[in-house]
């Protein structure tokens, strides 16, 4: 039986998305939690963010973490907005070395032009590469949109928070994805 590693209370998941960029280097993103936690609490989102940032680093990403919402820094109201804002603040306190922002709309998280308008003082906005979704619905839809319409290769779900590396595969995966996940699991060992 493989349990959570010390200090962790949950298992979560991360997808690593990769596509070639115009500069010739790969664009690499991390998206969480897209496969395990249906409605994570604020504290679970904090743990998911820390684990996702660590996973992103394994893939050469200098994580800039965005807690996603339909609101950017208070532009909207509601329980879901509060949850993401509070989780981002808690994550910033727990991981002060990480650039973390939230709550952010996706456009403010990835577009420098939009970020200059919506949150000009943010270090993360416009440059986010590690995305924390409010729930599994948003996360699963988000990574599949990136994969199918954004031409990203999706690797995952990579299971996070466990004492030993294990992973899962989608029923829709192909042989190349099975091979890649075996390599990823070995790299996590």
Language-model features: where?
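Anion-binding alpha/beta catalytic cores of soluble intermediary-metabolism enzymes, centered on
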Residues: 1-189
């Amino acid at each position: 039986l493989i349990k959570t590693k010390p200090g962790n209370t949950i298992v979560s998941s991360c997808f690593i998305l990769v596509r070639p960029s115009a500069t010739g280097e790969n664009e690499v993103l991390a998206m969480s939690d897209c496969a395990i936690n249906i409605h994570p609490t604020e504290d679970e989102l904090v743990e998911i963010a820390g684990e996702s940032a660590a996973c992103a680093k394994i893939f050469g990403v200098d994580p800039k973490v965005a807690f996603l919402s339909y609101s950017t820094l208070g532009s909207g109201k509601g329980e879901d907005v509060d949850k993401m804002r509070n989780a981002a603040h808690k994550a910033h306190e727990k991981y002060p070395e990480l650039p973390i922002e939230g709550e952010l709309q996706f456009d403010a998280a990835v577009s420098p032009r939009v970020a200059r308008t919506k949150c000009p003082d943010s270090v993360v906005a416009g440059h986010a590469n590690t995305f924390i979704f409010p729930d599994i619905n948003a996360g699963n839809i988000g990574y599949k949109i990136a994969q199918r319409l954004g031409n990203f290769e999706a690797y995952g779900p990579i299971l996070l928070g466990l004492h030993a590396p294990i992973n899962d595969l989608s029923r829709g995966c192909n042989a190349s994805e099975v091979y890649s996940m075996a390599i990823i699991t070995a790299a996590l060992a």
